[in-house]
Structures are given as structure tokens and as C-alpha cells.
């Protein structure tokens, strides 16, 4: 089936938009794993709860941007509490214990959201409703704006890690936790802050993407599987690799949907995952070991 250039360009934009949101989610998960060696199965539920905080804040204030900030702050604090009460006592033990703990947290949060908000999906209205014409097809401005916002948040994270004092502490903790603590860096609070930052990024992703898909108690499950695929393909703990993998996989799915249904196009990401595990288990976008 022939595909017009206009449709190809639209799918390219769709892939980039989805890829940037996925990169934002994956960045938080990668940050947590790269520094703490914790596989957080509850990460998708932080996205879901962030979206619900956005729904409530938007209903109270009418401001989408206030809802975005409130979701990030509330879930950052909530993530820190979850870490301190559930994960911190398990650090240093068998990694399976933290996996089971985060999986349990995920189930609890899903069922809490179902009990509190019900099974009916909620809606967050787009702050921008305009469209522009690309060739003869209309494309929403909001999709481009959320891609730009996601890129700005990821860029801010990179600058924070590169130049901020707390970011330097985080990088020092990643390289040698014992030496960092010996130099006076408060490693336990650095780890708490890292988990809070990762949770906030998931919450921001939930609010940004909610106008496109709606908000329900199971939305985190849909995201966490794809996020783990991105993290593995990009290289476990590799922030830049996760961003590249998110855009790469989203573009592949977008292009595949030109010929097959979107439900079938999802298979592409699993094919990439299997090929990565078979031929380059360190990740497609991970630096080649010297």
C-alpha cells in the first residue's frame, strides 16, 4: 500500500511526541535504577497517581499548568515516603525483595485508585485546542507543546545532574557510594531525593499525556511495560540511551501503523527487545565497552 509523504510526516510527528513522553517516563526509571539498583515496578502507578492529582487540581483551580506542577510536587513527596517506608529497609538485600516490594506497591496503588476514583476514565482538557495544517492534514498544537515540554524537563534534569550541587552528589554516589559518604555527602538523603525526582518525572508525564488518552486506574500498567522495554534497549542505567531508545521505538511503532493497526504495531517494540537481548544485551544505545 502506497503511503503519501503527508501521512509519513504526520506519523513522524506522532512518533516524536510519543517518544518524548516515553523518554520522560523512562528517564525517571533509569535514574532510579542507575543510582539505586532498584527495579521499580510501581513507576507506572506514580504516573497514574500524578494524572489523578492533575485531574483534582484542575477541577479545583482550572489551571492546567498548576495541575502539572502540583502533580510533580505531590508525587515527589509521596515517592519519597514510599522509598523511606518500603524500599530503604530492603536496600542491600536480594534484589528480588525490592522487585516484589515495588510490585506489591503497584497493586496497592492500582486498587486504591480504583476504589477512590472508580473505573470510569477521567479527562483532562488540553490547554491549547488549536491546530495547524500540515499539507492538507490538521495537527494539534498541543502534541508539539508536550513534546517540547518533555524535552525541556529532560534537559533541565541533565543540567541539574551536570552542574547542580545536588546533581554532583548524585553522580558521586553513582560512582562510589562508600567514598561519597566518606567525603561527607549525605548518601541516604541523596537516594531519597533521586527516588522523589524519578517519581515527579513520572507524575509530570501522566499529566502531559492525560489529555490524549484519559486517566484511569490501569493507565500505569500500559506504560510500565513499554518503559521497561525502552530501559533495556537503551541500556540499563544509561540515561541518554533510554531517551534515544524511547524515540527510536516510538518512531518504529508509528511507521508500522501506516501498514498495520496500532495494536499490531506494538509488536515491533517486543521484536526490538528480543533482538537486543539476543545480540546486544547491554543495550543498543549503551556505550561499547573498551
Regions found by a protein language model. Name each.
Residues 1-7, 82, 87-91, 281-290:
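Transmembrane alpha-helical segments of polytopic membrane transport and secretion proteins
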Residues 1-24, 53, 61-67, 93-98, ...:
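Membrane-interfacial amphipathic/re-entrant helices at transmembrane-helix boundaries
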Residues 7, 25, 116, 175-182, ...:
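Cytosolic-side transmembrane-helix boundaries in multi-pass membrane proteins
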Residues 13, 35-81, 85, 259:
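Membrane-embedded helix boundary and interhelical linker motif in transport proteins
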Residues 18-19, 24, 138-216, 239-244:
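Helix-loop-helix "hairpin" substructures at the membrane interface of multi-pass membrane proteins
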Residues 22, 26, 62-73, 192-202, ...:
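Transmembrane alpha-helical segments in multi-pass inner-membrane proteins
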Residues 62-105, 112, 244-249, 280-281:
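Alpha-helical transmembrane segments within multi-pass membrane transporters and channels
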Residues 89-163, 190-193, 255, 260-263, ...:
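Transmembrane helix-bundle core of multi-pass membrane transporters
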Amino acid at each position: 500500500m502506497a503511503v503519501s509523504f503527508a501521512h509519513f510526516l504526520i506519523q513522524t510527528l506522532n512518533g516524536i511526541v510519543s517518544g518524548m513522553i516515553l523518554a520522560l517516563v523512562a528517564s525517571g526509571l533509569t535514574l532510579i535504577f542507575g543510582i539505586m539498583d532498584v527495579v521499580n515496578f510501581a513507576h507506572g502507578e506514580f504516573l497514574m497517581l500524578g494524572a489523578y492529582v492533575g485531574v483534582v487540581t484542575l477541577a479545583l483551580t482550572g489551571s492546567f499548568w498548576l495541575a502539572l506542577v502540583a502533580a510533580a510536587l505531590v508525587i515527589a513527596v509521596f515517592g519519597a515516603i514510599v522509598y523511606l517506608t518500603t524500599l530503604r529497609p530492603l536496600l542491600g538485600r536480594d534484589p528480588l525483595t525490592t522487585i516484589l516490594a515495588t510490585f506489591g506497591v503497584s497493586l496497592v496503588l492500582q486498587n486504591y485508585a480504583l476504589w477512590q476514583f472508580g473505573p470510569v476514565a477521567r479527562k483532562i482538557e488540553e490547554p491549547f485546542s488549536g491546530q495547524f495544517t500540515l499539507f492538507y492534514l490538521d495537527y494539534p498544537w498541543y502534541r508539539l507543546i508536550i513534546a517540547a515540554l518533555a524535552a525541556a524537563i529532560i534537559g533541565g534534569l541533565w543540567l541539574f545532574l551536570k552542574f547542580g550541587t545536588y546533581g554532583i552528589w548524585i553522580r558521586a554516589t553513582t560512582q562510589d557510594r562508600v567514598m561519597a559518604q566518606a567525603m561527607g555527602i549525605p548518601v541516604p538523603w541523596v537516594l531519597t531525593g533521586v527516588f522523589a525526582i524519578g517519581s515527579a518525572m513520572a507524575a509530570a508525564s501522566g499529566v502531559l499525556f492525560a489529555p490524549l488518552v484519559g486517566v484511569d486506574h490501569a493507565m500505569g500498567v500500559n506504560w510500565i511495560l513499554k518503559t521497561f522495554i525502552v530501559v533495556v534497549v537503551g541500556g540499563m542505567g544509561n540515561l541518554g540511551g533510554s531517551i534515544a531508545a524511547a524515540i527510536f521505538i516510538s518512531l518504529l511503532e508509528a511507521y508500522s501503523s501506516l501498514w498495520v493497526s496500532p495494536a499490531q504495531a506494538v509488536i515491533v517494540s517486543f521484536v526490538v527487545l528480543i533482538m537486543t537481548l539476543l545480540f546486544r544485551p547491554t543495550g543498543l544505545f549503551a556505550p561499547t565497552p573498551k
